[in-house]
């Protein structure tokens, strides 16, 4: 019997979402009954690639109110619906440290629509910022945010982290251990397929 196929699609702005995709792939390939794992940027995903999956993992950067690559994947809705076992993850500077889980879950639902993402597991991780790679638009927007945070009479830890990241050229808050619950969910799917 052929090993199940896991396709990991990622929409990465500054590389953090891709890093999580790579870590997920490494952990899955290290399983005793390892599935076949393929990674692809969302922009390169085809219907055929998506339909070849037994398990589909979709990861996206959450930046400026949008999930990177979501509009592209909405065009692949029919292909995604052929894969029963789908799960999602988001990567943002603060993750669930600042955003309530329900807020990020809602971003997934709004971005991919309920028929694709509804009742599917969603995981949320912290990423980072790379000022040297940031577009002028993002830098301008973050300058306003940084200024507002600096003017707050009581800055929380995450306000301070954003200010420091901006002033130090970036920050990386990724943590490989955060993927463990996602990998555990994939293990459940793999057991169902066995």
Model-inferred region functions:
Residues 64-194:
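FMN-binding flavodoxin-like domain, especially the glycine-rich phosphate-binding loop
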Residues 1-83, 180-194:
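N-terminal beta1-alpha1-beta2 submodule of the flavodoxin-like/Rossmannoid cofactor-binding fold
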